UniProtKB/Swiss-Prot annotation:
Belongs to the gasdermin family. InterPro entries: Gasdermin, Gasdermin_pore, Gasdermin_PUB. This is Gasdermin-A. One of its GO terms (biological process) is programmed cell death.
Length: 446
């Protein structure tokens, strides 16, 4: 994870443990998640690695008829946090020019993060609803209606009260400075320091509620939503062949144990397993070329979502033909692309290396074993590791594995052996588990 993700996930966990407060993943996007901003949720998302929202560059006010502006969001309280995070080695941190970056990421003992929560007042929303209708001819609304998208309104945010620089000396093991990792974009040494400055007014986490459109220009934002609710009335969407992905896990259902994650991943791998041997091999080749190119993976994800929206066959060079002939297969691939794009580019490159060295089964077993024992563990701790989990690995393979899981927050120490469990890293470990499961399946017969 990047340092910014470490900050936002830990903050969301402390303010709203296992709740509906969504941590912001990218510092560069914080201005697009202010109150009243309209966002989209990824169709094939899962709460295991977070309901994933993407900005739209529009606010609710932009798509309403002209009229009076609502009152400013109200302040719901201030909070201060000290010693909130533990820095971890990471690859290059991708942040906007306005953010000062030194090294790669963490929190110093002297740093204090002061935040406030801002929310849209119920009276302000009620007055806005009475006074301003939807602009029915707005191009953005027309496009979203045509695609059958669900829109969400940011209703509450947690933002910084002042600029703060978070820093701490890196905890890199010696292995991270070996030349072996240079091509993977990993850096760090025992004494390496890292820091990032987060600007005042930066949104760190947010809550959303679904926008509902009734008829041509009526709208509402209900307090409670379920997975059957859609922003636009179903009867108004053209084309009956559209394929809309809806999962029970998309709407606030919290998962109780590792078994639920395992079953979810197995359901998706079963769809991939139905592909022909040639199709699976082709898919593995395509993914091997894309891993480490996060932007290209994200572009493929968006294109595939678009293909599902259109409801007809499309041609995608990155995917084998029999994937595109099956909506269920496309659905499953979209699920795994969501998991892989959660991982850093460095981790994606490590996955390719692991694939080449045929050690994916060992890595999958390691992640599965630790999550099975600690999935509900809500406190940090050091736990013994079964020696046989790593005994089959050579030195280079062991280093590779330590780096791969370490970048998801699972620190493995050979002495013992043992590992450090941090509950804040659970979403990233879930994504890594899904990614390993897919690649292991695809590589079995290759």
């Amino acid at each position: 994870m990047t340092m910014f993700e470490n900050v936002t996930r830990a903050l969301a966990r402390q303010l709203n443990p296992r709740g509906d407060l969504t941590p912001l993943d990218s510092l560069i996007d914080f201005k697009r998640f202010h109150p009243f901003c309209l966002v989209l949720r990824k169709r094939k998302s899962t709460l295991f690695w977070g309901a994933r929202y993407v900005h739209t560059d529009y606010t609710l006010l932009d798509v309403l008829e002209p009229g009076s502006s609502p009152s400013d969001p109200t302040d719901s309280g201030n909070f201060s946090f000290k010693n909130m995070l533990d820095a971890r080695v990471e690859g290059d941190v991708d942040v906007p020019k306005t953010v000062k970056v030194k090294g790669t990421a963490g929190l110093s003992r002297s740093s204090t993060l002061e935040v406030q929560t801002l929310s849209v007042a119920p009276t302000a929303l009620e007055n806005l609803h009475k006074e301003r209708k939807l602009s029915a001819d707005h191009p953005f609304l027309k496009e979203m209606r045509e695609r059958g998208e669900n829109l969400y309104v940011v209703m509450e945010v947690v933002e910084t009260l002042q600029e703060v620089t978070l820093e701490r000396a890196g905890k890199a093991e010696g292995c991270f400075s070996l030349p072996f990792f240079a091509p993977l974009g990993l850096q760090g040494s025992v004494n390496h320091k890292e820091a990032v400055t987060i600007p005042k007014g930066c949104v760190l986490a947010y809550r959303v509620r679904q926008l509902m459109v009734n008829g041509k220009d009526e709208w509402g934002i209900p307090h409670i939503c379920n997975d059957s609710m859609q922003t636009f009335p179903p009867g108004e969407k053209p084309g009956e062949g559209k394929f809309i992905l809806i999962q029970a896990s998309d709407v606030g259902e919290m998962h109780e144990d590792f078994k639920t994650l395992k079953e979810e991943v197995q359901r998706e791998t079963q769809e991939v397993e139905k592909l022909s041997p040639v199709g699976r091999s082709s898919l593995l080749t395509s993914l091997s070329h894309l891993l480490g190119k996060k932007k290209e993976l994200q572009d493929l994800e968006q294109t595939l979502e678009g293909a599902l929206d259109k409801g007809h066959e499309v041609t995608l060079e990155a995917l084998p033909k029999d994937v595109l002939l099956s909506k269920d297969a496309m659905d499953a691939i979209l699920y795994f692309l969501g998991a892989l794009t959660v991982l850093s580019e460095a981790q994606q490159k490590l996955l390719v290396k692991s694939l080449e060295k045929k050690i994916l089964p060992v890595q999958l077993k390691l992640v599965e074993s630790t999550m099975e024992k600690n999935f509900l563990q809500d406190k940090e701790g050091v736990f013994p590791l079964q020696p046989d989990l790593l005994s089959s690995l050579g030195e280079e393979e062991l280093i590779l594995t330590e780096a791969l899981v370490g970048l998801s927050g699972l620190e493995v120490q050979r002495s013992g052996p043992q590992y450090t469990w941090d509950p804040d890293t659970l979403p990233h470990l879930c994504a890594l588990y899904a990614g390993l499961s897919l690649l292991q399946l695809l590589s079995k017969n290759s």
